[in-house]
Amino acid sequence: QGKFKPKIFLLADQGFSTYSTLIETRRELVEKKPDLVRRFVDASNIGWYNYIYGDNKAANALIKKFNPEMTDALLDYSVARMKEYGIVDSGDSVKLGIGAMTDARVKDFFDKMVRAGVLKPTLDYRQAYTLQFVNKGVGVDLRPKQ
């Protein structure tokens, strides 16, 4: 639309290794209702597979309802770029499923933040996340076979 080809710089290509999107909840909910949390995470992952690889017309209708400036063309373009650049489904998610997380990647980002002086090395960053609900391959069967 802008009549120019933008230059794209993915932060991940520059060594920024953190996750861009997370599902957050309270520790109390994880402890008291883990099945609820698991079902929410699983449904979110399945929803992403269906949106990116399946029929996303119903989802796009809701997006446009609450964001009237969005068009089918813009949404189609966005999905195509998400696929092209592996924004949602690439790296660890290829094997572990959308929403994949690893202790190694979280530690890598923590170490970078310590070196940059953003976080103290004594912070127990492991208390901030759990892998309990991810890395189970939920939805990978919905990805088209190549």
Summary of predicted features, one role per range:
Residues A12, E28-V30, V140-Q146:
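Short, structured secondary-structure boundary patches
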Residues F16-T18, R81, T130-Q132:
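Short secondary-structure boundary/hinge segments and terminal tails
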Residues V106-Q146:
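Conserved C-terminal helix/tail region of periplasmic/extracytoplasmic solute-binding proteins
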Residues F9-E24:
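Extracytoplasmic ligand-binding site segments that recognize negatively charged/polar headgroups
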Residues S20-D35:
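A bilobed periplasmic-binding-protein/Venus flytrap-type ligand-binding module shared by bacterial periplasmic
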Residues E31-V118:
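Secondary-structure end/capping motifs
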Residues Q1, R26, K65:
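Ligand-binding pocket segment of bilobal, Venus flytrap-like solute-binding proteins
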Residues Q1-L11, M70-Y77:
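Ligand-binding "clamshell"
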